[in-house]
Amino acid sequence: MPIPALPSLQQLENAEEFLARHIGIDAADEARMLPVIGSETRAELIDGIVPAAIRRAKPMRLPAPATEADALAELKAIAAKNKVFRSFIGQGYYGTHTPGVILRNVLENPAWYTAYTPYQAEISQGRMEALLNFQTMVCDLTGMAIANASMLDEATAAAEAMTLAKRSVKSKSNVFLVSGDCHPQTIEVIKTRAAPLGIEVKVSTVSETLPHLMVSGEFFGVLAQYPATTGHVHDLRPLAGHAHQCDAAFCVAADLLALTLLAPPGEWDADIVCGTTQRFGMPMCNGGPHAAYLACRDEFKRSLPGRLVGVSVDTHGQPAYRLALQTREQHIRREKATSNICTAQVLPAVVASMYAVYHGPDGLTRIAQRVAALTAILAQGLAQMGREPVNGTAFDSLTIRTGDDTPKIIERAQAAGVNLRQRLQQHLGISLDETTTRADIETLWALFVPAGTPMPRFDDLANAVPRLPEDLRRTSAFLTHPVFNTHKSETAMLRYIRSLSDKDLALDRSMIPLGSCTMKLNATSEMIPITWPEFANIHPFAPAEQLVGYAQLDAQLRAWLCEATGYAGISLQPNAGSQGEYAGLLAIRSFHEANGQGHRNICLIPSSAHGTNPASAQMVGLQVVVTACDAQGNVDMDDLRRACEKHSDKLAAVMITYPSTHGVFETRVKELCELVHEHGGRVYVDGANMNALVGVAAPGEFGGDVSHLNLHKTFCIPHGGGGPGVGPVCVVEDLVPYLPGHATAGVASNGVGAVSAAPLGNAAVLPISWMYCRMMGAKGLQAATEIAILSANYISARLKDHYPTLYASPNGHVAHECILDLRPLKDSSGVTAEDVAKRLIDYGFHAPTLSFPVPGTLMVEPTESEPLAELDRFIDAMIAIRGEIRRVEEGVWPKDDNPLKHAPHTAASLMAAEWPHPYSRELGAFPLAELKLAKYWPPIGRVDNVYGDRNLFCSCVPVGDYKETEEA
């Protein structure tokens, strides 16, 4: 018998090892799946699905795949090029200590970071409780009535505050006043947002102060910083009163840590309060991700943008959390939505809320008092040296007039590894934080001490009085709910975090087959680098020479993404897909204006589009015209042609999703692009479904002008329960000059300002996508696309006799997702798509996308990461559910009393003394025998959505409510 040949060293090194870790289907699985679909090979399948006219002419040019160990080592070398200085820049970004129990058990825990946005309330109670804690924390600290469940960053939250004010007040003015004492990046983002909406932004200056600007009364809103970016604590109460006399809204960008000591804006009649929670446990991360917040008066709540967690009851009368007032949002109201915000910053919001739970009101107050005390000591020492701070009041920040000494002090600071705030004429700024030490104060004094002047002695100044105005001191209590006063030991905190994560269903438990969401593997090796100090402890406005590693990461990732999409340029600044859409449409609008075509203001959008598309279009001042889809779910080309001809002179853009939101590759997409170009418009190809394109087709090659990507879909950044995300905007050559700039960071653009607070957006999660691309290589990325398509078609084929696929190509194939049509079942059995979604919970699954893009359907996207066993488990569950529906159709079970109508089944409901249903308790709990081995138990029954909106309650539930329901 011949001895088998030994593998070569190259084979043993196995550079492509990660492909098999990321892709759940192997060659043997393929051999089983392909005959079910009716194809002999994967190549044959792809050739029959992806139109030949759009296939890539050449493979992607990317580095060969690296092993996990090699990729981590390579990225570590890049990270080492960043210089981690002690940053006292402030400007909205501060050092913080992330408690280890939160770092390990939330930020680095897949039970938290792999979860999806909590649309399915019954399997999201844990993170919604954490988000309700977040909302309560914000309301308590700001003194406002209601707060949402996070915004993208402080600057975009301020821009949303501006538009919220515009929608909510009586004033008909188009002028928005902004204090020059606001953070400069906030002012820039506000100006970017205001311009296409016809809002005039007036910024106060030294000579033209905010009170002076307010004299005319011609404005609809005002924004002030509290404390100011210079550190001064202004008394804003008179200005708030004057704004109300003018029928305008008074908005405040407030520091939450400072509000533990300062009178909250809600107590002096502010209307809207926004800001960031970054310093509540999230590192600076070169600008993100961090959870911003937005709070307002109760009467503004129906115009409040973003997610809002509210309290309702389940079918058993128990308190239950849910997303409230969703009719405000883009997925329902489309171009009439309050905002295009979709993905926000849930994971950082959970970190911030846990930080508040862990420290409690006393701990937060102590941290704030220590910061204020150190600031007073620093200020008094500087005054002794003749460097009296300009701001007589302060919480954590000082502005020092340095005149001609400025360059010398900066040079000394750099030599000492210290960053000071430099963008103040003849002045330098210093901001302290939770991490500041006695040694830091002494180092700072040494930088400013004039020659021959003795250094102050720290101990002599230890009793310096904080520089807070007496009449603005906080006297009201906050965070009084027991949740903020119970979990003080690490043991208690650990168990609280675990108790919440146990209530939820995330990717660490099962497949999440959500269509249009691409819930793929977030590999551990991809996640590890995000908390490296070289990435996490970098200030976004540090000097460029300290950001060399980030610059290399940025350049490489942009190059790889351009290669994947076929575009010429890309910006990574947008910190969500919604912001990428906004930036892309802004580029189109700016291009038309620069070319004397500013009158082009019509945006054509197919009726099947995601709600962010029309919401984003209206944000840049475009008028949305909806075009039809045909019976097969494709863009109706005849209707589109009529619309193009009708609006030819005004056509700015057409927005499409490709493959379509209906889950098919439309064969006439190149023709569509050519038609739009003939009429002077540009083609926006929504990148939501890029997981079906990478390696096989590129939007920039088949006619797209602009696309945004969702790195939290296609390129492995986790969804985090609803954020963070990254939405890079990709453009063709002539639109590159109109990508977002960032004047605050010295990044120029052709009149297009910043769309995010930080120049690199959610910079700290970019290493995740870098690692994914580096380990997969061109071959792996294309294989991922092809397997995603294979898996979707396998599910569609196996379920076709039970649930017809609504849309497919002429040969019966789908793209990377399929829409299962459940509408006929409602007539035959009374069972709805929602009933099936809830029953899937009993089988241990997160439901597919419910009733989008077609009401009464389920859209399934398995991704390439799921193994065949999990696909089969899902298919078996769906077939078993169809069997249950058949028993209703046959009259075995009543239409209103069956396992689907009462799903999901909680352990408590199954153990009730009485069981009045015509099916067994066992069937309710264990519809398949295998579930007896491992079972996810939903913590609540089905949520009453109507009750929740009629009885809106958006802060922590009084403990008594739980006791009452238990006694009942």
UniProtKB/Swiss-Prot annotation:
Belongs to the GcvP family. The keyword RNA-binding does not apply. InterPro entries: GcvP, GDC-P_C, GDC-P_N, GDC_P, PyrdxlP-dep_Trfase, PyrdxlP-dep_Trfase_major, PyrdxlP-dep_Trfase_small. This is Glycine dehydrogenase (decarboxylating). It catalyses: N(6)-[(R)-lipoyl]-L-lysyl-[glycine-cleavage complex H protein] + glycine + H(+) = N(6)-[(R)-S(8)-aminomethyldihydrolipoyl]-L-lysyl-[glycine-cleavage complex H protein] + CO2. Keywords: Oxidoreductase, Pyridoxal phosphate. The keyword Acyltransferase does not apply.
